[in-house]
Amino acid sequence: VIVNEESAAIPRLERTLLLLLGFAEKNPGISRILNGDALAGETDRLRTRVAQFYDRLETQLKQIVRDAEINEAIRPTVPAACAVNILLAAAEGRIGQYVRSEFKRPPTQNWQEQWQLLMAGFFRESVAQKPQHSLARQNSSVA
């Protein structure tokens, strides 16, 4: 759905990760599973499914970056796999903090500022200097 609604890479990446963080925030039990907490005594099948989920998400993010290279003529500052890995690691880290805080520190807290920081070094300078692509800026101008 996000891929069909957004044509530009930055909003697509942001909305995809924000969807993950928002879902985790609204579903603490799933957050534990995504973080690996609830998997200690679980079957290998569940552990495998979580790994597959993250692999598929990473593949989708890589596709967004590759599409940006083709359709928007922008490239990340490092190889796509490396660039996407840091985005996913940031989102996973936010979920981990949420679980460790006993669900007192929402994964979306301060995400917009962190997103701006991540994007500042993500794409080559021509895009990194255009923070207006952020959903936070779009939403704040609407209010």
Each PLM stretch: what is its role?
Residues 22-62:
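Short secondary-structure transition hinges
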Residues 12-15, 19, 49, 56, ...:
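Alpha-helical elements of Rossmann-like donor-binding domains used by nucleotide-donor carbohydrate transfer enzymes
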Residues 7-10, 40-44, 55, 74, ...:
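Alpha-helix boundary/capping and short turn/kink residues
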Residues 1-30, 80-87:
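Hydrophobic alpha-helical connector segments
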Residues 31, 35, 47, 69-117, ...:
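Hydrophobic/aromatic-rich alpha-helical bundle segments in the mid-to-C-terminal region
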Residues 24, 61, 65, 91-98, ...:
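Hydrophobic recognition helices of helix-based DNA-binding modules
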Residues 2-3, 65, 69:
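Conserved hydrophobic residues forming the short capping helix/wall of the S-adenosyl-L-methionine
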Residues 1, 41-45, 93:
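A short alpha-helix capping/helix-coil boundary motif
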